[in-house]
Amino acid sequence: MIEVLTTTDSQKLLHQLNALLEQESRCQPKVCGLRLIESAHDNGLRMTARLRDFEVKDLLSLTQFFGFDTETFSLAVNLLDRFLSKMKVQPKHLGCVGLSCFYLAVKSIEEERNVPLATDLIRISQYRFTVSDLMRMEKIVLEKVCWKVKATTAFQFLQLYYSLLQENLPLERRNNINFERLEAQLKACHCRIIFSKAKPSVLALSIIALEIQAQKCVELTEGIECLQKLSKINGRDLTFWQELVSKCLTEYSSNKCSKPNVQKLKWIVSGRTARQLKHSYYRIAHLPTIPEMVP
């Protein structure tokens, strides 16, 4: 049982979980603001769910291009949705808003040596605004999120839940659940605005619970129930979001869903620009396909 694990590592993880749960409600998007975006008609003048989702896919492409952590992407999405749920953003300004949120997340999470120059980031993103525009928008975003860049994200819960479940398994069974696959599933969910209305803990547990069902890891079912209890997650809420996650992942795996395309970033980097960029910038990562499990 997770709640009675006595190893030092387990106790540290449980302490971290309690701290995250305590902070969870802070620095999250306004649900009422997200609903307004979802209900908006696509007339070219108002922010819509479709435009928001396309912007997040572009941010995911940048994350893959630069080789940044999923945590960076998750925080960028949090910042973007917090801003969009508060402000009436015109579609023509969305690119600058999105890149500003992304850059804030990068500077907050990534090592300083891996942070790209603003000029390089704008060029690779294929935008026409200036560094001054980006810096000005950064300041606006910071003011509207009350200068609170750090936030509790679904990725943090995903890491903790996964680690706690691993502690509950014998060594020979710890490879049954692939964390990279869970990360890819979370990225897919982030590309849909509806999942920003879910509590980060609920979204993370929904993804893990579905994966455990899919891989038939029955020995972890009790662990999921313990995590649900520890996190004070309502059973109906968990079922509701699991169904939405399942639908999202099914659509994401189909040809109907437009996936982030990091390859388009590859072609706009000239030879001169490529030589000027740090080597780590020019690693073209694979598209964020959800990896298959090895039987």
Swiss-Prot record:
Belongs to the cyclin family. Cyclin G subfamily. This is Cyclin-G1. It comes from the Eukaryota. May play a role in growth regulation. Is associated with G2/M phase arrest in response to DNA damage. May be an intermediate by which p53 mediates its role as an inhibitor of cellular proliferation. InterPro entries: Cyclin, Cyclin-like_dom, Cyclin-like_sf, Cyclin_N. SUPFAM superfamilies: Cyclin-like (SSF47954). GO terms for biological process: cell division. Keywords: Cell cycle, Cell division, Cyclin, Mitosis, Nucleus. The lineage of its organism: Eukaryota, Metazoa, Chordata, Craniata, Vertebrata. The keyword Glycoprotein does not apply. GO terms for cellular component: nucleus. The keyword Nucleus applies. It is found in: Nucleus. Pfam families: Cyclin_N (PF00134).
